[in-house]
Amino acid sequence: TPAAAETTAAAEENEETTAEAAEGSEAAEAGDSAFAGKTLIMSTNAEFAPYEYHDGNDIVGIDVDIANAICEDMGASLEITDVAFDSIIPEVQSGKADFAAAGMTVTEDRQTQVDFSDTYATGVQSVIVTEDSDIASLDDLKGKQIGVQQGTTGDLYSTDDFGEESVQRFSKGADAVQALSTGKIDAVIIDNKPAQVFVDENEGLKLLETPYAEEEYAIAVKKGNTELLDAINASIANLKESGKLDEIVAKYITAE
């Protein structure tokens, strides 16, 4: 009957509306639908294994996998630009990059330049020395020549603690390690995970048992870009809850 047909049509319409609402809810949970179908540009410095490094022509690592997972969660695509570490924040500030993921530590100074997401990993600054070094503690670093990657927290902390005259800056962590191996400097201060990689790959080096500083890694976005920041934070929360974040880290870092 016509009345029955109208009721059926109304029921089908209600089902469609419910399905649309469910899809909308899922999109909201997955981040911000405003970024669905868009390409987001990430700025990084691919000299920081296992967080970001070159594998042939590809840039891979923990940050890359996390960024891909975040973009997938938001329905967006990811494009990566590889720049010098101290160029990353200017890239984000100028809008050349939408966000930065580069094993970047949250510091008070950086918080005046960019907005940071929730923490997705923690790091420790470590000291690399040669196996025959007379440096056995942090106090022994006084008066020594310390190599750092320019613009990193290792650079910041070393300069603050030991003075400008004690710090030699390199564009790449690997260059600092090479200078240590050839006797041009006495120690290298860099994040623990890359430090472990450098020690494993270069004979005659070791890590001091005492960590230099502990810190938190987060994603940087342009100041005031709350829409993207909220979407990234929602995706980070989803990755933590699903266990995906731990899976990504475990893929690159085995338990010690």
Describe the role of every protein-language-model region.
Residues 129-146:
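Flexible hinge/capping segments at coil-to-helix
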Residues 29-32, 77, 153-170, 203-211, ...:
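Ligand-binding clefts/hinges and TM-proximal coupling segments of bilobed small-molecule sensing domains
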Residues 75-77, 93-102, 144-145, 172, ...:
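Alpha-to-beta junction loops
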Residues 46, 121-129, 196-237, 253-256:
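Periplasmic-binding protein-like
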Residues 65, 79-92, 133, 150-153, ...:
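Short helix-initiation/N-cap motifs at beta->coil->alpha
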Residues 29-103:
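Extracytoplasmic small-molecule ligand-binding "clamshell" domains
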Residues 1-39, 256:
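Short, low-complexity disordered leader/linker segments with a strong preference
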Residues 87, 104-112, 157-160, 181-182, ...:
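A ligand-binding cleft/hinge motif common to bilobed small-molecule-binding domains
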